Each structure stands twice: as C-alpha cells, then as structure tokens.
C-alpha cells in the first residue's frame, strides 16, 4: 500500500494523501495561479521542494539556518485581549502588556498597536486615547511599533457612514450615483487616515500598517494609495506597510486609476509597483485560501503568486499569512503543522523578505511563524534588520548585510542568541531579559540610532520634550 502523508484541507481538516496525489495537487495549484495572473508556474525543482516540505515527518518544520526573516503583524494585541468569538483568546490585559508580551515573550521582530474595532474611522473619536497608549508603549519598548488599522471603506456607507451604499444604488441601476458614492467615500478614507496618523506619529509611532487594503474594492485601494502618498510627503521617515485584503483587486467601481493604472483586476505582482510608487516601505501581498482545496493546492498557488510579487516589487515584501491567506487554513486556531510548512515554503521558495502575521490564536500565529522562520526580535537581531527594511527599503539580504557589518559579526550571528545576548548588553541596545541598569525603551533606541545610523521617531519626540 502506498505511503500516505498527513496534510490539511483549506478549512483545516486533516486529510491523507499519497506522494503522487500531493504532486498532482501542487501542479494544479501553481497552474491555476499562473493562468489567472499570467505569471510563470513553479519550476520542477521548486515543485519538488514544496512537496518535500509538505511531506516532512515532523509536526513542525522551519527554515534552514541563516534564512530567517523579520515578521510584522496584523490585529496587534487583539489576539490576546480580544474575545469576540474569533481568534482572540480573551486574556484580560492592557495593550501595553500585550505589546510587550509579543516583544519579550514571543520574540517578535516588530509589533503594532491597534484599536479594538481595528479600523481608522472608529479611531477618530478616541484618537487621544490611542496617542496616550502609543506614547506609553514607545517609552517601554525597543522593537519597531506601528499603529495598525484597516482602511475599511465599507464603514463610510449607510447605515454606518454618510454615503449611500453603492450596492443598493447598483441594484437600482443608478450606476453614476454608485460611482460618485465610492469616490466620495475614498476621499473621506484618505482624509481620516492621514488625520489619525498625523496624531499617532506626533505621539511617537514608528509608522503605520494598512491592513486589508482593498477590502471594499478598487475604491478602498484608491483611497489608501492616496493616503500613503500624502503621509510619505508629510513624513519622509515614517515606516509604512501596506497589506492587501485579497489576491485580486475587486472592480466595484471599475474606472479608478492610480499613476495611470486601472486598479480593478490587479494581481499581487501588479499591485506591488503601485504600492511602492505611492511611498510604502513594505508591501504585503495576499493569496486567498480555498477552503475546499488541499493545503498542497493552496500553498502551491500562494507561493506562485508571491514569488512573482517578490520579483516585481521594488520594495520588501512581507507576505500576509494569517488564517485564510498565504496557504494557511481558514481556522481560528490554525494547525501549526500547516502554518510552519507554509512559512518555510514562502521563505525558501517564494523568497519573501518577511511575513505579516495575521489573524489566529497566539500559538497558531505569532509563535508558530516565529519558531518556523522569524528572527526572534530582541533575542537576537530581528528588530535591527526590520528597522533597515523599513527605514531604507532594504531587501532582506541587504538589510542583514548592513546590520551584520554595523555589529561586526557574521550574518549567521544575527539569529544566534548566544552571540547577540552578550553583544546587545555590551552595546546597550536593549536586551530581552531584565537587567538592572541596562538601557531600556527610549534609551536603548537612542543607542540603536547611533549604531545603525538612522533616526527613530519616538527618540525624536523625546528629544523635543527635553529641549
């Protein structure tokens, strides 16, 4: 009897497949992506590599040593303190505790602060609270801390917003009115996002993470791109990450353009240059998971799309890999066997510069991804490499070389806890364990500024406050 291997379906259910079936599923998945995106399918060697990863006997797998990448985040601390019946585990804790738990306990390379409603529009009435939380977090933390939220243009339509729902207008054959409603909503999205981030950046935020860009279609992406453009013009040093909602931009409007390019129907490799043109530092491409297909099919398809996006992108790519995207099953508690295999494949085959950790419980998302492919933050040098990707738009290889040279170590040492533990204490750039007298928070980040020859926003704020 042929040997069968334990894989997953797109909904997380376990399924057993032979090697021949796995190879067949990989071929079908990459062919689907190649056909839709008009991009190259995976080569025979790449498909063999993917099959090898999927058939590895261990419950968890990880990237080869030296191939680790930094991670960014969606949903912030909501995966810890959230309790809405989704992936939040309902631990009563402050957002400061949540952020520092990711930094000190999970080994995160970066982190983000976010509102419980996690959209920019609801932040407006409570922006002062968000600014206070950001200031307190920045005073205590060392790794880059973003403010994260969804553009979520749907909130600008009735009954939640001021503009008539374009779906209702289209059903009434009021096409022109539907277009105008989307255009007005996009303008308000841009305005609100810029206003919120002006406040947060003035409170020390390292930058902004636009999560699920394009969720409401091409108007949503249009408004977000213009927000990125405005923020980059006003704040040249702001870290900006733009993560997508789906693999293909839905043409709800159909005629909206950015930089002369029609947004409707763009695939990840076509989205990347526009996001870079707008002024983002990091692009978060997406490939949606099909819950009725196997993990072999889904992962092959996702890796194919992401490989093309990485090659086309002028800026680093942090592939979105929460539940339901990036080859990850659509399950609130993502199976760690599937998560770690997807994580490894994205790094070793697609060549991503990082991973944006999305929705999922703490063990199934940040812990699994960081164990599989992360640089482990302050335990090593992950936060330093992440800062170079965002402050100078460096791809992963260049960022590692730069940081290694500044530290006077080999690139392999950047993820060596033994080397970095002593070196971080010697340089006083923040250490993960509590040592009395060692630089923490702002003090550690000021030393990082000198080491890497960069400016950090929270340090600039502190200098203004004591001037």
Curated annotation (Swiss-Prot):
GO-annotated molecular function: dimethylamine methyltransferase activity
Top-level division of the source organism's lineage: Archaea
Keywords assigned by UniProt, alphabetized: Methanogenesis, Methyltransferase, Pyrrolysine, Transferase
UniProt EC number: 2.1.1.249
Disulfide bonds: none
Entry's induction text: Induced by growth on trimethylamine but not methanol or monomethylamine. Part of the mtbC-mttB-mttC-mttP-mtbB1 operon.
GO annotation, biological process: methane biosynthetic process from dimethylamine; methylation
Record carries keyword GTP-binding: no
Transmembrane segments: none
Family the entry assigns: Belongs to the dimethylamine methyltransferase family.
Subunit structure: May form homotetramers or homopentamers.
NCBIfam families according to UniProt: dimeth_PyL (TIGR02368)
Record function comment: Catalyzes the transfer of a methyl group from dimethylamine to the corrinoid cofactor of MtbC. The major or perhaps only DMA methyltransferase expressed under inducing conditions.
Protein name: Dimethylamine methyltransferase MtbB1
Source organism per UniProt: Methanosarcina barkeri
Gene: mtbB1
């Amino acid at each position: 009897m042929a040997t069968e291997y334990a894989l997953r379906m797109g909904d997380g259910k376990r399924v057993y497949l032979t090697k021949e079936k796995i190879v067949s599923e990989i071929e079908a998945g990459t062919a689907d992506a190649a056909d839709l995106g008009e991009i190259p399918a995976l080569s025979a060697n790449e498909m063999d590599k993917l099959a090898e990863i999927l058939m590895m006997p261990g419950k968890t797998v990880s990237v080869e040593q030296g191939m680790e990448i930094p991670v960014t985040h969606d949903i912030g601390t909501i995966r810890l303190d959230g309790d809405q019946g989704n992936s939040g585990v309902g631990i009563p804790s402050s957002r400061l505790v949540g952020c520092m738990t990711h930094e000190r306990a999970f080994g995160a390379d970066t982190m983000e602060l976010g509102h419980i409603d996690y959209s920019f529009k609801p932040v407006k009435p409570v922006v002062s609270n968000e600014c206070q939380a950001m200031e307190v977090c920045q005073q205590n933390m060392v790794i880059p801390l973003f403010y994260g939220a969804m553009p979520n243009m749907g909130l600008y339509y009735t009954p939640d917003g001021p503009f008539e729902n374009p779906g209702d207008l289209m059903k009434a054959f009021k096409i022109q009115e539907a277009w105008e409603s989307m255009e007005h909503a996009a303008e308000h999205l841009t305005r609100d996002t810029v206003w919120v981030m002006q406040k947060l950046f003035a409170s020390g935020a390292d930058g902004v993470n636009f999560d699920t860009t394009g969720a409401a279609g091409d108007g949503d992406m249009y408004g977000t791109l213009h927000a990125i453009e405005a923020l980059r013009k006003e704040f040249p040093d702001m870290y900006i990450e733009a993560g997508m909602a789906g693999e293909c931009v839905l043409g709800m409007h159909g005629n909206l353009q950015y930089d002369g390019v029609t947004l409707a129907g763009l695939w990840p490799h076509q989205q990347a240059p526009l996001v870079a043109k707008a002024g983002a530092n990091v692009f978060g491409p997406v490939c949606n998971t099909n819950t009725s297909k196997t993990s072999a099919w889904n992962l092959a398809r996702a890796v194919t799309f992401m490989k093309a996006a990485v090659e086309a992108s002028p800026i680093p790519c942090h592939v979105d890999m929460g539940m339901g995207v990036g080859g990850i099953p659509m399950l609130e508690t993502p199976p760690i066997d599937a998560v770690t295999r997807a994580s490894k494949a994205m790094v070793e085959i697609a060549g991503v510069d990082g991973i944006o950790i999305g929705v999922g419980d703490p063990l199934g998302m940040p812990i699994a991804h960081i164990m599989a492919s992360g640089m482990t933050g302050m335990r090593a040098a992950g936060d330093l490499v992440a800062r170079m990707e965002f402050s100078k738009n460096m791809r992963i290889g260049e960022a590692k070389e730069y940081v290694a040279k500044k530290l006077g170590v080999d690139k392999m040492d950047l993820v060596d806890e033994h080397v970095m533990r002593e070196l971080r204490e010697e340089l006083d750039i923040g250490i993960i364990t509590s040592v009395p007298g060692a630089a923490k928070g702002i003090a550690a980040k000021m030393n990082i500024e000198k080491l890497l020859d960069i400016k950090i926003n929270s340090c600039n704020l502190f200098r203004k406050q004591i001037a």
